């Protein structure tokens, strides 16, 4: 470990102080001068005067500015032998010298050495000097940390990271799956590098670009790519770094940030998680947060106020665009809003190709198959997936990852860590029937997603799992698809009831019932897919703030609410009856599949369908199932 001079100084100062006081106390001038004459016995001053009156004192040596005397005395009490005795003298005893002279006692005074006085003075001044020096050192460090030397108490200085030419190691070629957003930002970068091609036709540089999208979709990665490509000064800061414990700090930091940005224009200012400071004003109980609102007001003024900010492009990222203040979103501040959504199949494939560049894979590994099997995965999820697969490959001591590691990693990312396999018991058989109930319905219903695999290996909180893979990216879902999913979700409970009886139905279907109820209620209240008609009965005016939402209530009558509950119950009941009917009609193949599942613990989708085909016809679907 390399030690800096500051670290060495920090450790050496206490050692020096302790050593100095140790040396002064035990090796100082007092020990040198008096130590050779020090006596083992002591005597009070009054007793010393008695000895002097009786003529027993022969010699007196004075030390320490006449505060200490070494007395040579002889007498009956001392065994008639000369004894050296130490006597502490009072501060003021003018008659002592006179008495000693009258008694003809040898008297000698030993003044302290000049070096002793110097060391005494240094000893008295050392601690205060070290204290003052330490405080000055800490104060200087505090100033440097908050904005540079000589800027004491600079709480209002911006904490933005400034890079004249940002070297993030990320360029646009490293960003995949968000082609539309890349085009927007490539245009911004071109505007910064070659503004004349735009100004020639009267175009103005955009003042702000807002990145909106779910977590993990690559918003911050895009900002890093812009910083790596733009070759202009780049400021980056988080929205949470503006407001702190002191009043007025947020607005002051905004002013300081934009002052620095204007001094270095043209430049880019990136504000990550802008929702921390850009929330709507006047919300919440009590009217909101005054300090945050002052910061937001200052930000609004700096972005498009009286003075303007020519040459400064503000790029912000958030996954909560619905709570941002409307004044912040208007043109002139954020001219463009770029949506960065979860990637589709092509986007996932491009992202996997980027992250697979530095991974060793077997030739049989198909990135297209992985992309098909991971609908809904964000860019961060896909990066984590391949990293987990690489870790698992190293753990298994393989030279390259295979589809087996990738399949296990997908299961881990989606459902959690693998648990201990179940032992053969009635509970294991019940779980097997539950999972096969889901899978058989998913295979036989035309509009249901195809089965990928069925397993009894526990993961997370689930004792068993049935995996379905959508045949394509479904941005639009039909009524028949929703109903098929409801029937499939009820398949596990239906199998429990048909096989083991109503008394043996377990709590294992609790999560299924939550999903079923949610889907059925959305069919009625959001999508207009019930007998109530094409009505949206969900309130769209609710805000994610306690203040405005406290007074909100339902926008329909009690009669309509009762009808909604009736329609939800009717949809679920019809789907449950259909699920039980499918279970009863396919009891033979279900029993065979359960026995095979208990034996193997995992059945892949192709094998599952091949067995079902021996007993009944299966609707044609698109299958993207990995082969091992």
From Swiss-Prot:
Which segments does the topology annotation call Stromal?
1-7, 140-628
Question: What does the record note about the cofactor?
Answer: Binds 1 zinc ion per subunit.
A GO-annotated cellular component: chloroplast thylakoid membrane
> At which positions is Zn(2+) bound?
434, 438, 512
Q: Which residues form the active site?
A: 435
Enzyme Commission number? 3.4.24.-
Q: Which PROSITE patterns match?
A: AAA
Query: Which amino acid positions bind ATP, per UniProt?
Result: 213-220
Query: So which cofactors does this thing need?
Result: Zn(2+)
Topology relative to the membrane, per the entry? Multi-pass membrane protein
Q: Kindly list the biological process annotations in GO that this record carries.
A: protein catabolic process; proteolysis
Where it mainly occurs, coarsely classed, is plastid
- The reply on keyword Isomerase is no
**PANTHER family named in the record:** ATP-DEPENDENT ZINC METALLOPROTEASE FTSH 2, CHLOROPLASTIC, METALLOPROTEASE M41 FTSH
Q: Which HAMAP family match?
A: FtsH
Family per UniProt? Answer: In the central section; belongs to the AAA ATPase family. In the C-terminal section; belongs to the peptidase M41 family.
Q: Its function?
A: Acts as a processive, ATP-dependent zinc metallopeptidase.
Protein name as annotated: ATP-dependent zinc metalloprotease FtsH
Native organism: Pyropia yezoensis
Show the taxonomic lineage.
Answer: Eukaryota, Rhodophyta, Bangiophyceae, Bangiales, Bangiaceae
Q: Which gene encodes it?
A: ftsH
């Amino acid at each position: 470990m390399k030690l800096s001079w500051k670290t060495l100084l920090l450790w050496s100062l206490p050692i020096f102080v302790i050593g100095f006081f140790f040396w002064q106390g035990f090796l100082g001038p007092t020990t040198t001068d008096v130590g050779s004459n020090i006596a083992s016995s002591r005597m009070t001053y009054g007793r010393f005067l008695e000895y002097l009156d009786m003529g027993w004192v022969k010699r007196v040596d004075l030390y320490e500015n006449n505060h200490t005397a070494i007395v040579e005395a002889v007498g009956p009490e001392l065994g008639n032998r000369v004894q050296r005795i130490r006597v502490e003298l009072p501060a003021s005893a003018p008659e002592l010298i006179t008495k000693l002279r009258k008694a003809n006692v040898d008297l000698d005074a030993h003044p302290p050495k000049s070096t002793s006085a110097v060391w005494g003075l240094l000893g008295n001044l050392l601690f205060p000097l070290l204290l003052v020096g330490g405080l000055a050192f800490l104060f200087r460090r505090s100033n440097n940390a908050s904005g540079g030397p000589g800027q004491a108490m600079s709480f209002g200085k911006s904490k933005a990271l400034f890079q004249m030419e940002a070297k993030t190691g990320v360029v646009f070629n490293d960003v995949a799956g968000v082609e539309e957003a890349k085009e927007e930002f490539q245009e911004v970068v071109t505007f910064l590098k070659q503004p004349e091609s735009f100004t020639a036709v009267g175009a103005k540089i955009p003042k702000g670009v807002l990145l909106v999208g779910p977590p993990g979709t690559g918003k911050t990665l895009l900002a890093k790519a812009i910083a790596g490509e733009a070759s202009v000064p780049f400021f980056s800061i988080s929205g949470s770094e503006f407001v702190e414990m002191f009043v007025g700090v947020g607005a002051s930091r905004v002013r300081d940030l934009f002052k620095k940005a204007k001094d270095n224009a043209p430049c880019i200012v990136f504000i990550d998680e802008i929702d921390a400071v850009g929330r709507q004003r006047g919300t919440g109980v009590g009217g909101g947060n005054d300090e945050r609102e002052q910061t937001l007001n200052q930000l609004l003024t700096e972005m498009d106020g009286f003075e303007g900010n020519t040459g400064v492009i503000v790029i912000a990222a958030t996954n909560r665009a619905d709570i941002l203040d409307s004044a912040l979103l208007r043109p002139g501040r954020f001219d463009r809003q770029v949506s960065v959504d979860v990637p589709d199949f092509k986007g996932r494939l491009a992202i996997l190709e980027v992250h697979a560049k530095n991974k060793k894979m077997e030739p049989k590994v198909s990135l297209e198959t992985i992309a098909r099997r991971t609908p809904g995965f964000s860019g961060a999820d896909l990066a984590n997936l391949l990293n987990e697969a690489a870790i698992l490959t190293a753990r298994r001591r393989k030279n390259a990852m295979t589809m087996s590691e990738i399949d296990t990693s997908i299961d881990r990312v989606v459902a959690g860590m693998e648990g201990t396999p179940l032992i053969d018991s009635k509970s294991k058989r019940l779980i097997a029937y539950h999972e096969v109930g889901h899978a058989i319905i998913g295979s036989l219903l035309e509009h249901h997603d195809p089965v990928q695999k069925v397993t009894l290996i526990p993961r997370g909180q689930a004792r068993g799992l049935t995996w379905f893979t959508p045949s394509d990216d479904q941005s639009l879902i039909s009524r028949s698809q929703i109903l098929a999913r409801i029937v499939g979700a009820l398949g596990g409970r239906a199998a429990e009831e048909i096989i083991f009886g109503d008394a043996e139905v377990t709590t294992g279907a609790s999560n299924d019932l939550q999903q079923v109820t949610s889907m059925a209620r959305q069919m009625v209240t959001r999508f207009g897919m019930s007998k109530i008609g094409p009505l949206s009965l969900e309130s769209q005016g609710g805000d994610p703030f306690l203040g405005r939402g406290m007074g909100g209530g339902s926008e329909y009558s009690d009669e309509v609410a009762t009808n909604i509950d009736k329609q939800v119950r009717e949809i679920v009941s019809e789907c449950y009856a259909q699920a039980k009917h499918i279970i009863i009609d396919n009891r033979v193949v279900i029993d065979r599949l359960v026995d095979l599942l208990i034996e193997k613990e995992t059945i892949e989708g192709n094998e599952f369908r091949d067995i079902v085909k021996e007993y009944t016809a299966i609707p044609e679907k698109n299958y993207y199932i990995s082969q091992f």
